[in-house]
Amino acid sequence: MSLYPIYNFSAGPAVLPEAVLETARQEMLDYNGTGFPVMAMSHRSEMFLSILHHAEQDLRQLLKVPDNYKILFLQGGATTQFNMAAMNLAHGFRTADAVVTGNWSRIAYEQMSRLTDTEIRLAAHGGEQFDYLDLPPVETWDVAPDSAFVHFAVNETVNGLQYREVPCLSEGMPPLVCDMSSEILSREFDVADYGLIYAGAQKNIGPAGVTVVIVREDLLERCPNDIPDVFNYRSHINRDGMYNTPSTYAIYMSGLVFRWLQAQGGVKKIEAVNRLKAQTLYETIDGSDGFYINRIRPNARSKMNVVFQTGDEELDRRFVLEAELQGLCLLKGYKTVGGMRASIYNAMPLEGVRALADFMRDFQRRYG
């Protein structure tokens, strides 16, 4: 057993609230006095349908989702949504637009381009413009008014980039399709500004295995009949999310996280905590006299994924190793970026971030 508290800074699957894990432990063999473990429940049983209903309603309340939006709990991860969004929403359109701001939006653009006859245009490219050290301002996006949609990722986990204000387009422009996997429920935004939102659960929602999709009802009219039903949003909605067996346990766990968020005071309260956590780490980096380096423009720094390095690969490796020995786990940066990355999603307690900041200062004292 570790001498230190264990803090999980993984980018995903990520930390889950301790209270949620405790509830899941207590209900592992007997859910709510039913005698059934959730993992063994039929997805069509009244017991599970109640779990699904409450998860959907709690998410709708947390995000203030308007009535004309449908919520789905699907499988396949956010990467499947790169394809599903294009397959369902681009049908009959000559073009769709994509904004590339980092690793995952780049992959989304590439995948969308493969799966539809619609031309996927680059509305902006943060790599070409800023070497992924800043974000293309929304007002500079080259959006075609008659495009099917505009796809973007609001937070880039690999590069440590995040739009400070959640982007929205003016009336009459194409609907926004947004990958919110790594920041959904971390701050307030207006769902009505978007046509479709998707998010893999394993960062801010719950364990891996479920993907949340929030889609405006009128866009479902675009879904073509000649794509497989399993990839058709309308097929899932027409069957109340039961087209195939959903990820029952991941949905149950996500529902527990939604209840935990409500108990914390909702998204507005968790946003304030997230702001303080990010501030704690960035102040430590900026106050290190150059020992720690974060090259991202300050107004584009992510509050979810804080990337940094020492400028010495061997010292970075030593940092990751020594941090883990003190219970600060999974801080290694993404393979294409290197350095360190601290993912500080909703469930990461402020105490964990402060412990990391203390370790960073101590490490600098010893090796600076």
From Swiss-Prot:
Pathway: Amino-acid biosynthesis; L-serine biosynthesis; L-serine from 3-phospho-D-glycerate: step 2/3; Cofactor biosynthesis; pyridoxine 5'-phosphate biosynthesis; pyridoxine 5'-phosphate from D-erythrose 4-phosphate: step 3/5. Pyridoxal 5'-phosphate binds at residues 78-79, 104, 157, 179, 202, 244-245. It catalyses: O-phospho-L-serine + 2-oxoglutarate = 3-phosphooxypyruvate + L-glutamate; 4-(phosphooxy)-L-threonine + 2-oxoglutarate = (R)-3-hydroxy-2-oxo-4-phosphooxybutanoate + L-glutamate. GO terms for biological process: L-serine biosynthetic process; pyridoxine biosynthetic process. It comes from the Bacteria. One of its GO terms (cellular component) is cytoplasm. It is found in: Cytoplasm. Its EC number is 2.6.1.52. Signal peptide: none annotated. The modification N6-(pyridoxal phosphate)lysine is found at residue 203. Binds 1 pyridoxal phosphate per subunit. Belongs to the class-V pyridoxal-phosphate-dependent aminotransferase family. SerC subfamily. Catalyzes the reversible conversion of 3-phosphohydroxypyruvate to phosphoserine and of 3-hydroxy-2-oxo-4-phosphonooxybutanoate to phosphohydroxythreonine. This is Phosphoserine aminotransferase.
